[in-house]
Regions:
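Basic amphipathic alpha-helical segments that dock to polyanions
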Residues: 48-50, 54-55
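The DNA-recognition helices of helix-turn-helix-type DNA-binding domains
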Residues: 39, 55, 93
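Amphipathic alpha-helical dimerization/coiled-coil segments
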Residues: 86-104
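N-terminal helix-turn-helix DNA-binding core of bacterial DNA-binding proteins
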Residues: 3-47
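A cross-family signal for key residues in well-ordered alpha-helices
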Residues: 17-20, 53, 87
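Beta-hairpin "wing" of winged helix-turn-helix
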Residues: 58-72, 77
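Basic, amphipathic "hinge/linker" alpha-helix immediately C-terminal to the N-terminal HTH DNA-binding motif
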Residues: 72-89
Length: 104
């Protein structure tokens, strides 16, 4: 099965990937699409941008527009709530991946 067939299942991992980078510094949508592609995810703008907007509405990200006109970019950064959620998720992911990889 292709990655697109697993998109719903991978959505949580993609959100964690976004939070990870947004906690390290600012990011924008096109950069994030390329970053995800480097990790084997095929995410379209029609998938990523609604995800970013939803994460912002839920308080995990905050954004600001940099530049003007055609060069304007919406830059995203993790909020305290987003960084806290990422820390919590990391502990859960470590536990889960330990089970998946080691078969515990």
């Amino acid at each position: 099965m292709a990655t697109a067939d697993h998109q719903e299942l991978l959505g949580g991992l993609i959100r964690l990937h976004v939070l990870h980078h947004a906690a390290e510094g600012e990011l924008y949508g096109h950069w994030m699409i390329e970053e995800l592609r480097r990790h084997g995810y095929r995410v379209s703008p029609g998938t990523l941008y609604p995800m970013l907007h939803a994460m912002e509405r839920r308080g995990y990200l905050k954004s600001k527009v940099q530049g003007a006109g055609r060069r304007a970019r919406r830059m995203y950064r993790a909020t305290k709530k987003g960084r806290d959620a990422l820390a919590f998720a990391k502990s859960r992911v470590r536990e889960l991946f330990g089970e998946l990889i080691e078969g515990r």
